[in-house]
Amino acid sequence: WIMGTFDQVHGLAGWQWLFLLEAIPSVLLGLLTFKMLPNHFSQAKWLSDEEKAIIDKNLKKDLDGNSDAKGKSSFKDGFFNLNILKLGAINFSMLLCTYSMGFWLPTFVKSTGVSNLLHIGLLVAIPSIIGLVAMLLIGRSSDKYRERRWHLVLPFVFGSIALFLTQMFSTDIVMTLVLFSIAAIATTGTIPVFFSLPATFLSGTAAATGFALACSIANLAGLVSNTLVGYAIQLTGKPEGALMVFAVCWVFSCLILLSLPK
């Protein structure tokens, strides 16, 4: 709707207005978060003293029950840690798929025959909504069963299969959305579970350092994702060819996950 309505308003293309208008809520929310979000749960005004005590007790219980994390709490433990590098590689794959799907999904939808910009925008929102719902369900299941690895491996496996199958249904809008929705579960739905992994074998400063390092490695995906997609499309001659690269990335991510401590 934005691209169609605001195209050439004040000399700007519709896609330029899209970036400008969609950026405003993010910027405002960032400023609001910086001002209102406390640094520690003990500073949260919306929590009662009893609730703060429960949170503190649960955090200490998690740390005491995690034998792998004991004694590994320094900056050095978090920075020079092979498992953290593995997490960085996994997160790199996750972001690579997330960025590429986010930027190129409209192209894949358009290739099925949908041409109206508003319709494309509404359709590409479906996988994101499903990924959001999956995020809540997968996170709840992971906490319920106190299990992390297989709550990541299984979505990655199904996501990889879905991306492989996209080539067979490149002109079918329904199957395209179904397959991309499965892929969205693997990218978006697994985020909370993934970011709970550093605390399973690190604690304190080491966990924070490891978290930051894994994110820094992963953010390199933003630099290479579009270039990689463009090169893959040029090489294969069709947009779906780029998805094979991401499917392979998820396969390697599964292997790396299975090598991490339980």
List the model feature ranges, each with a label.
Residues K76-G139, I191, F195, S225-N226:
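Extracytoplasmic gate region of multi-pass secondary transporters
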Residues A134-E147, I233-Q234:
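Helix-to-loop junctions at the C-terminal end of transmembrane segments
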